[in-house]
Amino acid sequence: MSSDDNNIASSASSGHGAWIYITEKTPDVLDILNRLVLTSADSDVTIAPLLYDVTVEPGFELTVKCPLMLTDNNVILKLSNFMPCVFIINSTSSEDFRFCEDVVGNVSEICEGAASRYGYTADFTEFNERTETTDSDVCSNVNVPESDYFVYIACTYGYKELLFKGYLIPHWQDLRDISIGNRRGYKIPLLSPFLFTQCKDDTVQLTDQFILDNGFYNPDLTKTLYSYIFRPLAVSLRYLDVTHLISVTLNQYITDTHATAKLCDKKVYTCHGNNKLSTGDRDVLALCDILANEVTVSYLTPFLDSAYDAPSTLDFYSWPIVKDKTHAEILENLDQFLLHMSVHIGTLIFSGNSVLYQNKISKVGGQSDGSNGQSVEGLLKSIYHTTGIQLLYEDGYDDTRSLVRQHTAKPKNLKFNMDHLSFGASFSSHVLTKIVWFLNRSEEYKTTQSVSSTCYLVINSSTGTCTACDGKHCNTCIGALMCRMATRFPNINRQQKKEPCVTTLLTRMFADMTILGSFGKKYNTERDTQQKDGRVSAEPLDKAKYVLNILDYCKRECLIDSDGNDTLKISSKQEFIKIITGLNRTIDDELIKLLSDMRKHSNAKDDLNNSTMSFTLDLNPHAYAFSPLLQFVYMKTLVNILESLAIVVIAEKISSYPMTQSAYSRWVKQHFQSVYSEFKKSIYKKGFLTLSDYKMKNTTTNDTFTDFSHLKRDYKIDNTVRSSIATVNYQCRLWNFHVSSLRDFRIKYKPIPKNKDSPYFQKADKGIQNPVCGPLSFLITRFHKDIFPNVNVSPMTLWQRIYSNTLKNFNVDLGDKHDVETFIKFMFEQTVEYEGSNSIDVRPETILQYIEFRFVNRLLHASGHRGQYIGIVQALCTTLSDTKVDGLPCYLDSSRTFGTVSEYHAYCREYNGTVKVGRTRPYCNTNGMFERRPLVTVPYALEKYTGAAGNASIFQCGQLGYFSGTGIDRNLGMINRTSDYNFMRRKHIFCTPLTDVLFTKISRGAHVFDFDMLKQRIKQLLDEHCGGFDIELAILSEILKHVKEPNYNDLLFITGYQEHIASSLFDKIKVLDELEISSYSIESLQEIFPEKEELNDTEATGSGYDFSFIIPKATDVDEITGLNIQEFTNIEDETPLVKRMRL
């Protein structure tokens, strides 16, 4: 715990918990905000990020000690933290923030209708008699023209309920001049009502007419706070009475009732409609449900309304994509950044286990006994979060198990619809509008059964039959979107089960994502300082020093630069052999040293088997200030985490005190205080969540504030004539002097499988591999022209002929025969040797990766790990690609209607402009990616387990999980009968590196999609080594039969990102386009691309190249390496794919 006077909490100054900002409008700032805000068509409130020099002044204090109430002439200060967003009230010119907004249709009606069907109804009747304050009133009060200024509110987490209720009092006389960037502005404090009145009977229901008459109440602001903050919280908690939830959180903040149960009286449960659960199971599930609610509500605001550092990303003009850029460049960079984000938002929507849907607490049945209870371990295994989409189709029961809410009838063969998408947005029209914007810029995945979204657009725009927009905006409306993305939405009919949770968050600096993670890292080992037999124990194992020696060698030999990028140059076959031989010798020498060092440590092998990759995700709310939509995701994730962690103490309590009362609320009120007090201890230093604790000194001080009693007597709203403000020196007391803030949580992955017999990690028999598909393929393809300067065919074609020993049929000059034979023999030897100890199911793509893979493979082989793959973590990096506008109609003019589909495509061909779309591409260096501070979309499972023998504590661990769904991303792969289970040994993380984007770089040392099926066929073609003709023509024929006009990025994906093949294919496609060829059979392609070097039998000069004595056979590999090569997959038709295609 930090208790010095210089910690964030102690050094926080006194300040108000909410402000009204009035700042000048300029075209530049409007252009910027238009790209960053959340809007809704029928709301005059816009949600914008809290950023320095954009919405707040530089140096704006995020953590302040707010004057909350006046008691016995003493001011009570409470530490508060500002929300990372502001709320712009823009009723006079609401179109200012809609330049970049898609017209998505009647989203508010859709959201409210869905919310009502799910049971979340809004009630604003309590505000009927309130006096409204508009942005025009604010501008008038401070005497500025409303057309030149806009008005917005910044508020702390603790004050948000007071702002919602309209209880905060504007101090119009305390008008402060500020400067935001080069714009002039003002700000006015919003004062707590309890500086002027008292709350009674521990219930905050203010009746003081001064508060009701003068409190800052804006109906659109109240509704926006309801839909963006409070109802999403209620949805995450499965708590239908949102109004009661708001009153509870307000009462808790003012009256400090955190340790008492507040929600149980009005909770509605759905577990009683589950016929698979016994009565005892239902009671246990109901108690877990409500207690998770109570714990989360009690801790959520105190955690958020605490002390936090201001991250560097709050300074907008220091972002690398903004700094020193022209205004046009800034806007272009922001637009591209949003397209990168579209991949993450799409993943959240298309994943069936997304945090946006995963709000339901479920239980495995048949494990509880109503009288005897259940063990803690059993409860922890049986209680889990799952998707709550189907809560729409479940009955609701009250505290006494009486039916209070009838379910909505569930149709047969139900498909994902607008109600479900609204549920993902927690029924917020602001959030849903932005989600639709991102999905409109995502790719459509077509299947053989998918409905044509183009037909939907053509028919509904011409006839006006679209129910979402009446046919006026079918290029962007939510109705057309539901049709276009139908194949990518999750399947909601699948069985509900325990699954990982997918979320999108920022990583922190610490990450260890090397292949063996924590093994041999100094931070993970402690030196035993005890002496044994007169000798000092060995130094901690340090794998890094041996790897650094290899890197030093590479730098001396100019193979890599200081940043690890490849710099080697190869100009001949001999030089290639010399470089690789020297590098391999260095790797093996350092490996021998490491193995020798490992012998000194008795537990080194166990440490190797338990090696752990890990990274941390940021829980500072201000890290997400740049995106209000990510703030929404952050809050959903935080609630999910707190509920999951609460299950630990809940399970212990239920196990000790089984339910015996007739009403759940009686049991909850009896036991909640102990649950509340034990929760903090149960999560502190338990392996998952990291908190920062602060202790504040000087709990009693003196400070000068407005004379609040005088202000109430002489309250004025007219500020045209400035007058002096009466002030008083008050004695101030802190509400509490211990606070805890959220720092991060950790996600781990163990790459070495525990189950040695698991089929998912067994190595299949691939036979003798072609070197072009081996560990050095990245070099022989990169330096193909340097190694074979007189060869005009592609690397794949040449090595296929070498492999099949058919070069003697072609006139080709490979160079000196002895050099060629030596080089080819060397390549096959390296390929066979590498594969003999290979445990990594990925090919290296750089020198650094080759070093790491070879080092790890040989280390594992020497340690007894043989015949098995290990798990790997694949970073899928977002990238932007050019695409055709046909698939992204959001870029077209909405007023244009089309009579036929052909007319639509003809119009698209005439479209002028570049259209980009966000996609993903596998990134070879996962650890290097995490050094670039990426925004990640990651699936994780929160596991709970007991400690070692003698330790009764329950620990938590975040385990890297999987994505659930078939339409998430085509790089996630496909499960099929002929798969070798590589999808089971690969974990994927979507990454967008933010270094050089938002962060400045710090120098230091069962849909089956057409593309998926095609990629599998091409992979099989590349894996089958049979000769007879150019393998590239077979690949080209297969691609052109299925893909119309593929672009370079399509070819990269289909060929597994083998650039040399994609480039060669792309060149051939250009030739075909110029010749206007329509037949893509292998025979037709052979006529267009004849073997230029093929001669007749009498003229063949390549007959001297016979490599049959060089290329090893499978029996040779068995004899040399001792590998047990077995048939892994049985394919009914053993005819090679190339031959089947020709037949």
UniProtKB/Swiss-Prot annotation:
Disulfide bond annotation, renumbered to this chain: none
Keywords assigned by UniProt, alphabetized: DNA replication, DNA-binding, Host nucleus
Gene Ontology process terms (BP): DNA replication
Positions of region (Required for nuclear localization): 1140-1143
Main localization (coarse): host cell
UniProt xrefs under InterPro entries: DBP_sf, Viral_ssDBP_head, Viral_ssDNA-bd
Record Gene3D superfamilies: Viral ssDNA binding protein, head domain
Family statement: Belongs to the herpesviridae major DNA-binding protein family.
Protein name: Major DNA-binding protein
Source organism: Elephantid herpesvirus 1 (isolate Asian elephant/Berlin/Kiba/1998)
Gene that encodes the chain: DBP
